[in-house]
Curated annotation (Swiss-Prot):
Organism (species): African swine fever virus (isolate Tick/South Africa/Pretoriuskop Pr4/1996)
Name of the protein in question: Serine/threonine-protein kinase 1
GO CC annotation terms, alphabetical: host cell cytoplasm; virion component
Induction (UniProt): Expressed in the late phase of the viral replicative cycle.
Amino-acid positions noted as binding ATP in the UniProt annotation, renumbered to this chain: F45, E46, G47, G48, R49, N50, N51, V52, F53, K65
């Protein structure tokens, strides 16, 4: 048995491990044109369109994402390659495929969890929530500058290093080319995060939609996961403004979640909102998170 295979089996049997993989999972080999990997046979996550597995290679855990070819095309691979060196974006290490699936081999961020589970049992303090949202805005700006829109910004698609409080954006299956001028009539993201103009009129513009989803993420960071707020709650007139946060924080959320898209906070003005006064406009690179993948896959 090879050392990477032994390491993966040891990880799977550790009841305290954060990998959330079933300890009874078997280990199989998977080969690409460049490398041999070892992968658990039971997923960490099962979704409607993809499954995510833990794998191992060259002494480091990695993620395997299987995306059904029947459900969606391989756009995610194209987008991740284009965003390869973009700060705050999950890194695609390698890609392969079989008859049924696109197989994305993706970096694993240690000590991390998605934001949905991060605030599952707790409401975040304003200082922490503000820094998370500011990071998110900077990352989305980086994606925007490369000519793309993520298309499905939500708690589940943001992972956070629980020690350093640094986030990364994942799951680019709904990402599309940026088009600021034309209305869009197809919604590829999550319905609960849809903007009101699409709900009412069946169209949206990409940047106002992005601002809306950022506002939704901000609202939900101040709530327990079971209390997550969505479009229908706002349209019903329920109060979505968190209590016990600053007036500038309340104003930011209100500005993002304005029903009239023409009065909503503009995408380009997000970063200069008074709520973020004093925060540095920088995103820490992957090597500072504890794993330098440039030296892992050779």
């Amino acid at each position: 048995m090879s050392r990477p295979e032994q390491q993966l089996k040891k990880m799977l049997k550790n009841p305290q491990a954060q990998y959330a993989v079933y300890p009874t999972a078997k280990v199989e080999r998977i080969s690409t044109t460049q490398h041999m990997y070892f992968i658990a046979t039971r997923p960490m996550f099962e979704g409607g369109r993809n499954n995510v597995f833990l794998g191992h290679q060259v002494g480091q855990p990695i993620i395997f994402k299987y995306v059904s070819k029947k459900e969606i095309p391989g756009n995610e691979v194209i987008v991740l390659k284009a965003l390869q060196d973009t700060p705050g974006v999950i890194k695609l290490i390698e890609y392969t495929e079989n008859a049924m699936y696109h197989i994305l081999i993706i970096e694993y961020i240690p000590n991390s969890v998605d934001l949905l589970h991060y605030h599952y049992f707790k409401k975040l303090e304003e200082t922490e929530a503000k820094k998370i949202i500011f990071q998110l805005i900077l990352i989305i700006q980086n994606i925007y500058e490369k000519g793309f829109i993520h298309g499905d910004i939500k708690d589940e698609n943001l992972i956070i290093d629980i020690n350093q409080k640094i986030i990364k954006v994942i799951d680019f299956g709904s990402a599309v080319r940026l088009d600021e001028t034309r209305p869009q009539y197809n919604m590829f993201g999550t319905w609960e995060y849809v903007c009101p103009e699409f709900y009412y009129y069946g169209y949206y513009y990409q940047l106002p939609l992005t601002v809306w989803t950022i506002g939704m993420v901000a609202v939900n960071l101040f709530r327990f996961r079971a209390e997550n707020f969505y479009l229908n709650d706002i349209l019903k007139g329920e109060n979505y403004i968190p209590e016990n946060i600053s007036e500038t924080g309340k104003q930011f959320i209100t500005d993002c979640l304005t029903i009239n898209e023409n009065k909503r906070l503009s995408f380009k003005s997000l970063v200069s909102h008074p709520w973020f006064k004093g925060l540095k406009k920088e995103i820490q690179p992957i090597s500072e998170l504890g794993v330098d993948y440039k030296n892992v896959i050779t």
